[in-house]
């Protein structure tokens, strides 16, 4: 019912504490065209997770609108020696293969965020590329600075906060956080 309300095609993601990296357990299916496809995908995801992690708990499934753009990763955490920092780079499932990332200490300014983007080997993907319009860099920079501020405001409770992927739309379309993974510090720390 939720998929029909959002409008097809949709993305489906499994919700389980044992599936923090959903793609690694087959917990993401994109471009589902109708309700029957959503149901079949959910059943297949649950079966795959059960085969990989027999004690896994499936809390449900998340249905999301399909969005297009350039996939980025933004992450913030605290290093015990150097303090809080941000990592930004090309995201989605390619982040570990490409390792196209930049680092900065927090707090992050808009100029520092732009500098991080300028360091990326794949920065051309954020501009006009192969007939596609340029991406919304202003919105991406605002998201980077906002994530820096959010982490610093809540660092007493947050150990790590990762947005992957953050979809960067065309100019004027903004950015969309498709998956966010917070890691909270143990109580009493």
Walk through the language-model features, giving the residues of each:
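ATP-dependent carboxylate/acyl-activation modules
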Residues: 1-189
């Amino acid at each position: 019912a939720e998929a029909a309300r959002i409008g097809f095609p949709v993305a489906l993601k499994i919700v389980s504490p044992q599936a923090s990296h959903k793609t690694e357990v087959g917990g993401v299916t994109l471009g589902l065209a109708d309700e029957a496809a959503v149901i079949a995908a959910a059943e297949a995801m649950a079966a795959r997770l059960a085969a990989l992690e027999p004690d896994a708990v499936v809390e449900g499934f998340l249905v999301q609108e399909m969005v297009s753009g350039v996939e980025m990763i933004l992450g913030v955490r605290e290093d015990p020696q150097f303090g809080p920092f941000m990592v930004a780079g090309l995201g989605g499932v390619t982040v570990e293969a490409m390792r196209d990332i930049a680092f900065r200490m927090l707090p992050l300014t808009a100029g520092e965020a732009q500098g991080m983007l300028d360091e990326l080997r794949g920065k051309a993907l954020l501009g006009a590329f192969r007939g596609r319009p340029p991406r919304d860099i202003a919105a991406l920079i605002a998201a980077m600075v906002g994530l820096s501020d959010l982490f610093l405001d809540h660092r007493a409770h947050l150990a790590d906060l990762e947005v992957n992927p953050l979809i960067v739309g065309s100019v004027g379309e903004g950015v969309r956080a498709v998956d966010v993974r917070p890691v909270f510090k143990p109580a009493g720390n």
